[in-house]
Amino acid sequence: MATGLTLAVDIGTGFTTAAVAVDGRLEPLRLAPDGPMRAVVSLSHDGRLLTGSAAADIAATHPDRAQPCPLQALENTDQVQLGSTVIPTIELIAAVLRQVVHEATRHSAGPPPAQVVLTAPVRWSGAEVDRLRAAAFRAGLTNVTLLPEPIAAARWQADPAGLRPGSTIAVYDLGAATFAATILTATPGGFEIRGEPGGNPDFGGNKIDDILLRRVADRAGKTDSRAWNALWADPSPSGQQLHTRIRQQVVAAKEALSTTTSHTVRVGGSVGDVEITRADLEASIDGELRATVTELIRTAENAGVRPGELAEIFLVGGSAQIPRISALLLEMSGVRP
């Protein structure tokens, strides 16, 4: 049996998170100043694949050289074009894994991890799993275990003393690109998937960003429609950089509104500032969020579980932190996340 450092990695559609096992306990690994590492991978002008904040900086000025969601790219295709260069998608994931291993090794001040646990989307088939394994091998990782994302989330969040074997839980996972709903049964050794996982592969945090951006555009247009339309139609490099900056502010607004009731998006020029409130956000996406809760309930019922029989609902994914989601889950299922 391998000994030494164990590293757990979750490459999400928006961010990559990781943890290391220390004395039998998992400790979160800081991959960026604010914790998780952005999922984006970019090609530098000297041909290197960059990850994290360095990749995000390139994406802001040269979006054609960036892949914002390498995990989704790995699922959908064998290769992508960054700038004028064709890159195998397994190389994108390998670049992310190399960076995570580097941070884990620096954190532990010892040898590289002896064991690596990688999460994989629960809906993935053998082909996608094989590509993920190939990416890990390309990154120099040989002792790799793959774990379905909802099981990994349950292991991370569950209180071992609070769940009896046979208890049923739900995992509500709203990532950057997709929504997944999974029902799990607690076992003496962990968790098992119960029934067929559900979800929506076309709805995630990115769609929420799009909806919120339209709300900002509507407000900006009412202030100075001519200036806003000219700004958003500007195809120049500086115009594209401004578009990226505004979109980044919209994403920041969505994240901030999980803990505050209002946030300002600074457009500049004659448009000035646009204030967005939590009520604005919730009103804009209420129908979409209700649909995700309905899908979670449908998934549970198809697995033979009534919502009231769920012992827990675990929230996973950055956009799952939107307060309205917890309120809707309690309202529609009777279970408080």
PLM regions: where:
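Hydrophobic alpha-helical hairpins/lids featuring a short glycine-rich hinge
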Residues: 82-84, 90-97, 122
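Transmembrane alpha-helix boundary signature
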Residues: 104-108
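Oxyanion-binding/catalytic loops of NTP- or PPi-dependent enzymes
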Residues: 1-73, 86, 109-114, 118-337
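Short, acidic loop-to-helix structural element flanking the phosphoryl-transfer center
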Residues: 93-102, 292-298
